[in-house]
Amino acid sequence: TFVNPLYLKQGSSFNYSGKNLGITDSFNVNGQKPGVKVLQFDVVHPDKDLQDNLFLKPSEFVYAFKRLRSLDDVPFMIETGYIPIKLAPELSEQIASESIFNYVESELGKEVNKTYLNISAEPSDAEGKELLNLADNEPVGLMEGIFFLDDGTPFEFSTMKLHYKYFKYDSFVDLANK
């Protein structure tokens, strides 16, 4: 197998090489210990946009959660997610304090292996400044999108605010094999 040295040199923060797209499995931690702190875990009625994104009926509910991700106890990401209750009825705050996608794989027998992401940057807000220890003039990287189960079912809508030092995403495009 040929590995392009440009890939090795760039050192992208994300390395999607496992079975699912979860941060626990995908973030290149270089020996650092990942951590998750649940800041909020509720059941809510989704707004119209969230219903559309997750293919929900108006009567359906979602888990709404906010988690602070860290490496060696240094916060790098604020994650806000919404998961339909019907897809993971036993989801709990305890599970959310670990890996939700690994739980889906081991307990529900499904994989979260597809995503549509919008990647951008924006000025940090009060939450980012406080939780990610950012100064007034420091931005956050923003990744927002839908994660899908292996059968194409929308599983989670998520917004991830990353400390700018961890916001690096490399891509390789090859149109030769059409």
Residue ranges and their predicted role:
Residues 49, 55, 71-74, 86-87, ...:
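C-terminal regulatory/effector modules of DNA-binding transcriptional regulators
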